[in-house]
């Protein structure tokens, strides 16, 4: 019975990503000229420029080294277009296995920036998550300095 569930899951994923191509074009055409409103945190609330509380709905990606196949522009287009995601969280796996940021920083940076760049193209907010079970302050400073320079 488990093989049938696995087969169904694979078929659904193929169908889901096959439909994403048209969503990508539509999102790029509609979102290219738009700029996302600035948001800020006041106390415990996310607020827009008018001071109204904002609630975003979205998707959190799993760690990049475990699910890199989803860290691409067509997945972002599908999630923003068909699912209506307004925010995407790209999770940088820092130190869990041999494919994590500590051992393969270029791979991790490529995965995360691919999602963020596609989020910008699709008019979606992006959160970059430095996901580490250990304190790696120096590596985090270096990484976020690079991200801040790229996305300022």
Locations of the language-model features?
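Bacterial N-terminal signal peptides that target proteins for export
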Residues: 1-8
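C-terminal motif of bacterial Sec signal peptides marking the signal peptidase cleavage site
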Residues: 17-18
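N-terminal carbohydrate-binding accessory modules
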Residues: 21-87, 102
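Active-site-proximal helices and loops of the catalytic beta/alpha 8
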Residues: 28-41, 49, 111-118, 122-127, ...
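Aromatic-lined substrate-binding rim segments of carbohydrate-active enzymes
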Residues: 72-145
């Amino acid at each position: 019975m488990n093989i049938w569930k696995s087969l169904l899951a694979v078929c659904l994923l193929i169908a889901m990503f096959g439909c994403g191509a048209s969503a990508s074009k539509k999102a790029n055409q509609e979102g290219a000229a738009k700029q996302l409103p600035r948001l800020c945190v006041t106390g415990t609330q996310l607020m827009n420029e008018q001071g109204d509380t904002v609630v975003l709905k979205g998707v959190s990606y799993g760690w990049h080294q475990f699910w890199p196949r989803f860290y691409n522009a067509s997945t972002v287009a599908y999630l923003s277009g068909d699912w209506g995601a307004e925010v995407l969280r790209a999770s940088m796996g820092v130190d869990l296995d041999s494919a994590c940021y500590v051992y393969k920083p270029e791979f991790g940076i490529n995965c995360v920036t691919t999602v963020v760049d596609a989020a910008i193209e699709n008019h979606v907010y992006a959160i970059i998550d430095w996901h580490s079970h250990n304190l790696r302050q120096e590596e985090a400073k270096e990484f976020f300095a690079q991200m801040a320079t790229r996305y300022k």
